[in-house]
Amino acid sequence: MTPGRILCALTAFLVGLGGAVAQEPKERPHVQKSQQAQAKVEREAEEMLAAVVRVRMKAIPNARSNTNLGPSREGTGVVIDGRGHIVTIGYIVIEADSIEITTQDDRTVPATLIGYDHASGFGLLRSGAPLGVKPMPMGQAADLAAREPVMILPAGGREAASLAYVVSKRKFAASWEYLLETAIFTAPPTMQWAGAALVSREGKLVGIGSLLVRETQEGELQVPGNMFVPIDLLKPILADLIEKGRRSGPARPWLGLATEELHGHLLVTRVSPDGPADKAGVRNGDIVVGVGADPVKSHEELYRKVWGLGAAGIEVPLKIVQGADVREFKLRSIDRFQYFREKPVY
């Protein structure tokens, strides 16, 4: 069965239209083969659904992320191996006090956050009890092409599943010191995007849901949809996350400020309390115009200049318009892991 046929059959099954799968032609031997193929796809679809779990998290009481993300969070996770490892989007589980996952057959078991990667945004959990489900195989997000059909699987079973298509694959620079060289943008949007599985025509995991976006493509035509983090970014760091909780190598410098691109300027919209920018005196409403002698006009320019200075701990010289003055600020960057709080161990 071709990849396109697989997705067609999966779509029909997951949305409750199993009988609508084309049965060609009508001679009895072919009908029997078609029924056997459909039964096989339905079994595979059930296994695929079983690998998608609901993630519920309660944050530690003094979590810094509670202000923006709330003390209780919920989303989706995907079982990726036989050892109970579950990948999700990290903002659901950062600064967790407790995490539980619920399977498709309504079993609820505890889970532990064992790895987090700020650069990609992935969070990695480990189930506290055997799940007895077949892991979802990881595919190649790099092979996805524009207009290719995909399936979005949030927690909630077949009723929550939806068919989408790839609108674009392109660079994504966010306001919170986050940059992906290639993100996957899909449409139409799902409202259950957080941690949702993006599944290819081959029935493999190719992305994890991150955001609802107004623009899935560049240009004047706005097409709302979702942004997915490519699963390809997890593969080279998975062993590190399992063994050490984070990727190997020097940490990027983090400043603790969010900016908005506005008419060729970077307007400061949020300063993380007690972060490097806050300690240096940067305030909401300031405008970042340069890193040292180099001008910056976009998120990408800012991040590349800052990250290019060295590892976390490096002093970052920012040129900032504050009020009517252009001032030079020196920010002592930190490893972002230092800022977020961990669950106390007694």
Stretches with model-predicted labels:
Residues 22-91, 98, 145-150, 239-240, ...:
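N-terminal activation segment of mature serine protease catalytic domains
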Residues 52-54, 86-89, 146-156, 186, ...:
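Active-site-proximal beta-strands of protease catalytic cores
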